[in-house]
Amino acid sequence: NEQIVINQFPFTGKMEYWTKPGFNWQWFGKTTTYYKTNQVWFNNITTTDKGELTTYGLDNPAFPITYADKGKGFVLGSVRIELPKTEAHLNLIQEHYGSEARLLEELIKPNIGKVILACGPLMTSLESVAEKRNDLIAYATDQLNNGIYATTTKTVEKRNAITNELEKIQQAEIVYDSNGNPKRNEEGPFLKYG
């Protein structure tokens, strides 16, 4: 069984959460289904008549990103989401969102976009496709699971890969606690929902 079914009984409003396959009595209740796992895509991008890149009006639009050197781009890819199977977490999800579509559109996709925006200032655009490419993935995954990093900004000199000239840029750095763990500006919302 690839779905979780939430059944809300009439009159009492009591909810049951069916996470395992098998026969269950619905008793005229209203059911809502969620996939146990879901792949969230953000891979669509197109060009305008003027030749500019855009994601406007597309299904599954790529997320914009701005790097420390003010380079701009889009992040394309996907994230696998796995729903919790505990009643407490499923109850929160159902009460706050009420459907899989709202969960994806109002919690998951906006938070993926927020995390990608937060990753940009941690590196230059060239670093994002070279030596820090894997860091970008690790930063995004960690922030999705645990919350947005607290950062400080420092002026650093970097050699421009195209002009070979030294440039001063504002680059964000992660703030760490005394145990060497990243400090967080906010707790990740996925922690609350399991």
Give names to the regions the model predicted.
Residues 1-115, 188-192:
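Hydrophobic membrane-anchoring helix/hairpin
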Residues 66-69, 74-75, 103-194:
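Amphipathic, coiled-coil-like alpha-helical scaffolding segments used for oligomerization/assembly
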